[in-house]
A protein has these predicted regions:
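Small-polar-interrupted transmembrane alpha-helices in polytopic inner-membrane proteins
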Residues: 28, 69-77
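Membrane-embedded alpha-helical hairpins and interfacial helices in multi-pass inner-membrane proteins
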Residues: 36-45, 54, 74-100, 104-178
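Membrane-interfacial loop-to-transmembrane alpha-helix junctions, especially the N-terminal start
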Residues: 64-66, 114
Length: 178
């Protein structure tokens, strides 16, 4: 009887992780499309303020955010007609590395604030997407990397921080992901 309970509990945990990842991916795609609908190309230019990137904060609370955000980015970039040819691969790789890094560094804080983790998406996206932009549209790697980093850091340090503190203040980290 005990082994059945454990196996069922393990299955519930796997199912919960899969469901969380799927919901996060769907939210990412929906938010990005909605933003692009309201303000065309605001989520796809070199200096982009992709509101959905604030969801990267979820990687501080659950490992399900790693595949969820990676797949969400992949789905949007594949489905967006204006995406660069390799953006589905490069952008998704940047999301994977950033969210995995965020999850691994989530306990490194400054007075309870996970600054390092919140900056990782800016770093990975700047390096990878900055390179991709330089390859396809030119303008220089460092300038493109700077543009990407500015947009990414702005979203994570504002909207991402607000989301982080809202989740913590309402103890939703335990309720939603516990």
């Amino acid at each position: 009887m005990h082994s059945r309970f454990f196996a069922g509990d393990l299955m519930n945990k796997k199912t919960r992780m899969l469901a969380h990842g799927a919901v996060i991916a769907a939210l990412y795609v929906a938010l990005t499309y909605f933003q692009n609908f309201l303000i065309p190309n605001s989520a796809t230019w070199a200096i982009q303020f992709r509101v959905s990137e604030a969801l990267c904060v979820l990687a501080l609370f659950t490992p399900a955010a790693i595949p969820g955000l990676t797949i969400g980015c992949l789905l949007f970039n594949i489905s967006f007609a204006g995406a660069l040819p390799l953006d589905f691969l490069i952008g998704s790789l940047a999301s994977l590395l950033a969210t995995a890094g965020m999850y691994l560094t989530r306990r490194i804080t400054i007075k309870g604030y996970p600054l390092l983790a919140l900056l990782l998406p800016a770093v990975f996206n700047a390096l990878l997407v900055g390179w991709e932009l330089d390859v396809y549209i030119g303008g220089g790697f460092w300038l493109n990397a700077l543009y990407v980093a500015i947009g990414e850091a702005a979203v994570l340090l504002t909207l991402g921080s607000l989301l982080y503190y809202a989740i913590k203040a309402r103890h939703l980290d335990n309720t939603l992901f516990g």
